Each structure stands twice: as structure tokens, then as C-alpha cells.
Amino acid sequence: CGMTAEELSRLTDPYFTDGRKHKERPAGLGIPFLGQAVEQSGGTFGIDSVPGKGTEVHFAFPLSHVDTPPFGDIAGLLLQIFIFDGEYEVVVRRTVRTAAGSDSYCIRRSECREALGDVYDGVSVQLLKKFFTSQESGITVTQAVKR
């Protein structure tokens, strides 16, 4: 639960893994891939970790890159992150920015599962997909991971 300063400093190295999460894999490509994709799209990316408490990964994509490279189908990717089984929380914040200011709201994985039931259900997946593909705003994701 949480990472040491050394682990955190090597987190974006695709050839580094602590060996705890996936003992059979010699490399961890998820975070390095995410960081590069966010950077290429002009978004923001950050990681906060406290040993004994947990790790939070924050990233935001500009609306102009929701369905273009480097991701292509960001809505589908976020849906996969949302329904992936395990002990973690995902918070997706939708923000609408106009000349007059901005408004935002959040959807949390835990609240969604409670409200919609099994997110593998077809109706639940369609509701999530609609949320992730709405063209009204940009998408910011915070994923709190318990290790």
C-alpha cells in the first residue's frame, strides 16, 4: 500500500517492476504508457504516493484528443479501467469550460457500482460509455490504487 521514494522515482520506467503485483511479468508498462500518452496529447499527469496509505494517479486529456491518437478510443479505455476487478477507487471528473467559467462533477467507481449494480451488465456499460463519450467537456481521471 503506497510506494517508497525509490519506487516512485522509477515508476515511469517501463523496465521496472517491484514484482509484487504481477510476479510473472518482468516489466510494468501501464503507468509509463499512460504518462507518454497524456504527454503526447497535451494533457496533465501526476502521481502521489504515501507508504502505508496508497497511491493516486491523476491525469487529464484535452477534449480534442478524446477519440484521436495516442489513445484512439479513450472512452473504451476508461470503461475498461472502471470495470477492472480489484481493490481501488476511480474518480472521473467531467469539466465544462466556457468563457464565463467552468462547472464540473465527479463519478466514482464505488458509487457507480452501488447505483448500477454489476457494471458488467449491458445497461450499466451503456450508461458508463455515454458518460465517457459525451462531447460536452474534457475528462480528468483520478485513480486511487491500493497495493
Q: Model regions: which residues?
A:
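Short conserved segment of the HATPase_c
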Residues: 3-15
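Glycine-rich ATP-lid/hinge loop adjacent to the conserved G-boxes
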Residues: 16-26
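Conserved glycine-/histidine-rich ATP-lid loop and adjacent helix of the Bergerat-fold HATPase_c
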Residues: 33-43
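HATPase_c (GHKL) ATP-binding subdomain of two-component histidine kinases
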Residues: 58-59
